[in-house]
Amino acid sequence: MSDLQDKISIVTGANSGMGMATVEALSDKGATVIMLCRSEERGRKALAELTGEKARKLDLMICDLGDFASIRSFVRSVKAKYPRIDILVNNAGFISLDRQETKDGIERQFGINHLGHFLLTTLLLDRMSAGSRIVNVASGAHKVGKIHFNDINLHHGYNVVRAYSQSKLANVLFTRELAERLKGSGITVNCCHPGAVATNMGVDRETGFGKTITGLLRPFFLTPAEGAATAIYLATDEAVSHISGGYFYKCQIAKSSKRSKSRRTAGRLFELSEEMVRE
């Protein structure tokens, strides 16, 4: 799959950081890339930057992963325009010091990082077939995570680590369970830890919190392109064409937490997620 001519792909969180690096890499290989962005302004800026360098087949489409109605509308638009989806890279991420909620009343980190991508992916499955690939950008933070089934929206004892690690563990569990459910279809789904990447994800746009810390630590971070390398590998490389349900780091299978390997927890989370996104 190294030549992606005629391949149609979607990248979420496509306007900056690893998402933008992923769009660049896939389009460089010839793919048509649908750029899913929440902000039209930031999306247009990224699109102009990417198409200013060279001719690329890019399609900017606006969608808020924290709004189920917006996701359903996006999927309807995609299906009206494209006959199939060959690659889906669920890259968008959100992190916040204070507890916030999505438009649907879900704790925002779980709502965007997991549920938004869960709904997007499951709605697009009927446009995928043998050879299609799904890549979920997870994080090593899943290793300290736990799924709080009795308080999934973290109304009690919220803190940023608890919320973020829960959402990232959900990414790994979703990958495992979906891989089981897709067995025999030829569609693969894998996830990865990108490493420590200097992106704007941790920066609160209102207060600027995180900018100083990010600035000080920037020399120790990976670039967005380096961080995106494993997701791009999973989306395109022949070496992983028959691997599904894996957790990768630096383009290799990596060790994930004990909790992330529980079939019972994965199945329970999948069923809860279906229930939470139901219209």
Task: Give the label of every model feature segment.
Residues S167, C191, T214-K255, K261-E271:
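C-terminal helical subdomain
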Residues A198-G215:
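A glycine/serine/threonine-rich, flexible loop-to-helix segment
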Residues L154-Y158, I213, I253:
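Short glycine/proline-rich turn/loop motifs
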Residues M1-V203, M276-E279:
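Rossmann-fold NAD(P)H-dependent dehydrogenase/reductase core
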Residues R42, R205-G208, T265:
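Short acidic-hydrophobic sequence patches enriched in Asp/Glu that either
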